[in-house]
Amino acid sequence: MMEAKPKRRIVTENGDTGEDLVLATLIGNGDDVGPLVRHAFEMGRPEPLVHQLKNVARKKEAEIEDLCKTHYEEFIVAVDELRGVLVDAEELKSDLASDNFRLQEVGSALLVKLEELLESYAVKKNVTEAIKMSKICVQALELCVKCNSYISEGQFYHALKTMDLIEKSYLKLIPLKVLKLVIERRIPVIKTHIEKKVCSQFNEWLVHIRSSSKNIGQTAIGLTASARQREEEMLERQRRAEEQNTGGLGELAYTLDVEDSEQDSVLKFDLTPLYRAYHIHTILGVPERFRDYYYENRLLQLQSDLQITYTQPFVESYQTFLAQVAGYFIVEDRVIRTAGDFLLADQVETMWETAISKIVAILENQFARMDSPTHLLLVKDYVTLLGTTLRQYGYEVGPVLDALDKSRDKYHELLLEECRKQIVTAITEDTYQQMVIKKEADYENNVLSFNLQTSDIMPAFTYIAPFSSMVPDVCRIIRSYIKGSVDYLSYGVNTNFFSVLRKYLDKILIDVLNEVILETISNNSIGVSQAMQIAANISFLEKASDYFLRHAAQLCGIPSRSVERPQASLAAKVVLKTSRDAAYLALLNVVNTKLDEFMKLTENVNWTTEEMPQGPHEYINEVVIYLETVMSTAQQILPMDALYKVGVGAIEHISNSIVSTFLSDSIKRFNANAVSAINHDLRVIENFADERYHSSGLNEIYKEGSFRSYLVEARQLINLLSSSQPENFMNPVIRERNYNTLDYKKVATICEKFKDSADGIFGSLANRNTKLTAKKKSMDMLKKRLKEFN
């Protein structure tokens, strides 16, 4: 065996230099000596290096020689062994040659069989490949047949999925170029056919959904109307509860709320054709084209829906028009909520803005044409239902409500004009007779319902009301006006519209009712009973104005206690009070005119009679009878303050008439007998005034202003003319006590006309009467002093 290689030893011979040792070490370690050689040549001193290399070579040769001497026996053994190996190799070679020959003989036959087998394998492979190709073709053709079947059955989604499978999984594998080419050419054609077919079905759906939009809109608006009715009923119950509980929660706000789920469950319409068409176009890779197609066609439909015909009155077509628009946008809302990203919100917003501007323009135009408040209200109600319905779907309906608000004044003008005609009819056809109520139901309808009762106790029937039938008739008209106004103002821009309603209520009471009453009052043909009944009616209408305000507050959902404060009353109440005073004045004018007809002092009195009168004139009885009739009637229907005004006015007019007659130019002179006769007449009137003042109960109310006190001027004048010392008039103390109402100039004028009978034909006989002479002197003195005073 070979021994292990001994470690390398470096022998240092005598004479070796340090450089030789370094070089020897580098070579022994197998290091690269190239840099050392290069350095030596670069320095121009290669000889020392060559010398060193030779020394190293000699050392190596010496080492080899020593190695051979040490292992020569081992070398010999190795050579012998190598010779034995060569002999064995020759024998092995001979055996291999023999075996190879025999193998060649046997393998020739097997090789022929192998070639046949390989040929069979090749045939099998070709057949297998052919079968595989055939299967691919058959499968592709079967898919084509299935695709055709789907198309014929209208199952376009499955047809497209089948074509997609053919394209992705089979088309590249089809070995037959002809078949592959045919399929490649037919696929686009089939896709185009499917797209056209789907578009055709979608167009049919567009026509159908447009024709269905009216029913959809009507159903949705009907649901909103039902919800509004339920809401109003709930508010009414809430209002009654609040009225009964004065410690309630105050004013509450309510909003109409209709659940979308309820509407969605009722509003059933099929969007499947739309979904299918969009899905198929998405599979075809052209979803954007279909979205544009849908948007353009729906926009055209909307523009067509927004066209109204002028051959049919708008009041007959507005529901169809508005329901069609409502249905259109309900469909669009369902599409945008259920079809994913098919429809953009901006597109729907554009369509809505188009619709809203057109609707507003149509409404403003049609409202301007309307001349019936009923028609305008019908349209307004339906428009607010439309707004409430579409607001639930997120549409901004403010502009539509603004259009309604702009027509508010137009509606109320029409309503006022309609109510004016009704009020004129009610007042014109009034009999001005106290209303006779025979049944409790009539009492409730005509009195209690308007708070016109004068007592909280139910009267006995038959009941004679202090007002005529005009009052409840007018109250019903005003109540219907309030209802009509509330109906228009409800569900509009302003939820708190009571202040607006209050303004319109004042308007009808002042500009319509009050004007008609004043026109009636100014009519010269009215009689005393008419004027008196009108005054009484105004008093009750003034009282009813509080009911009107409470009723308006009730309809607005405002607690009645908030309008029961004095400062909350209507301005019309003050105006009606003024008109009531005008009615009293008209009544007094009629009474005074009639009194003038009865009295006619210049005709009924002999101002220069020579006979001493024994009693009052006959005309004074007619005056008293007339006054009795007037006061009795007034006491039945007029309030106490009005009764007092009528009595005072009539009595004062009689007093003024007496004084005016003495001042009249038609009376040139009068004597003491005439004064005595007038004195008798005046006493009758004074007695009547006292009796009526006390019997009517006015003495308990007006303690310091009796009827007699309004005859004081006439009484003081008669007393002065009857006085034995008339010159005392010029005495300030006496005048202040007895004649304080008489005017100097009037007294002077009247006294100038006073001619005692002593100045007559038989005056010489009268001179014998000392009293008459003294009175005459006193009168002459008064005349003189009055002239001086004047």
Curated annotation (Swiss-Prot):
<dbReference type="GO" id="GO:0009846">
    <property type="term" value="P:pollen germination"/>
</dbReference>
<feature type="coiled-coil region">
    <location>
        <begin position="49"/>
        <end position="70"/>
    </location>
</feature>
<dbReference type="InterPro" id="IPR007225">
    <property type="entry name" value="EXOC6/Sec15"/>
</dbReference>
<dbReference type="Pfam" id="PF04091">
    <property type="entry name" value="Sec15_C"/>
</dbReference>
<dbReference type="GO" id="GO:0006886">
    <property type="term" value="P:intracellular protein transport"/>
</dbReference>
<dbReference type="Pfam" id="PF20651">
    <property type="entry name" value="EXOC6_Sec15_N"/>
</dbReference>
<keyword id="KW-0963">Cytoplasm</keyword>
<dbReference type="InterPro" id="IPR048359">
    <property type="entry name" value="EXOC6_Sec15_N"/>
</dbReference>
<dbReference type="GO" id="GO:0060321">
    <property type="term" value="P:acceptance of pollen"/>
</dbReference>
<dbReference type="GO" id="GO:0090522">
    <property type="term" value="P:vesicle tethering involved in exocytosis"/>
</dbReference>
<keyword id="KW-0175">Coiled coil</keyword>
<keyword id="KW-0268">Exocytosis</keyword>
<dbReference type="GO" id="GO:0005829">
    <property type="term" value="C:cytosol"/>
</dbReference>
<dbReference type="GO" id="GO:0000145">
    <property type="term" value="C:exocyst"/>
</dbReference>
<comment type="subunit">
    <text>The exocyst complex is composed of SEC3, SEC5, SEC6, SEC8, SEC10, EXO70A1 and EXO84B.</text>
</comment>
<comment type="similarity">
    <text>Belongs to the SEC15 family.</text>
</comment>
<dbReference type="InterPro" id="IPR042045">
    <property type="entry name" value="EXOC6/Sec15_C_dom1"/>
</dbReference>
<protein>
    <recommendedName>
        <fullName>Exocyst complex component SEC15A</fullName>
    </recommendedName>
</protein>
<dbReference type="InterPro" id="IPR046361">
    <property type="entry name" value="EXOC6/Sec15_C"/>
</dbReference>
<comment type="function">
    <text>Component of the exocyst complex involved in the docking of exocytic vesicles with fusion sites on the plasma membrane during regulated or polarized secretion. Involved in polarized cell growth and organ morphogenesis. During cytokinesis, involved in cell plate initiation, cell plate maturation and formation of new primary cell wall.</text>
</comment>
<dbReference type="InterPro" id="IPR042044">
    <property type="entry name" value="EXOC6PINT-1/Sec15/Tip20_C_dom2"/>
</dbReference>
<dbReference type="GO" id="GO:0009860">
    <property type="term" value="P:pollen tube growth"/>
</dbReference>
<keyword id="KW-0813">Transport</keyword>
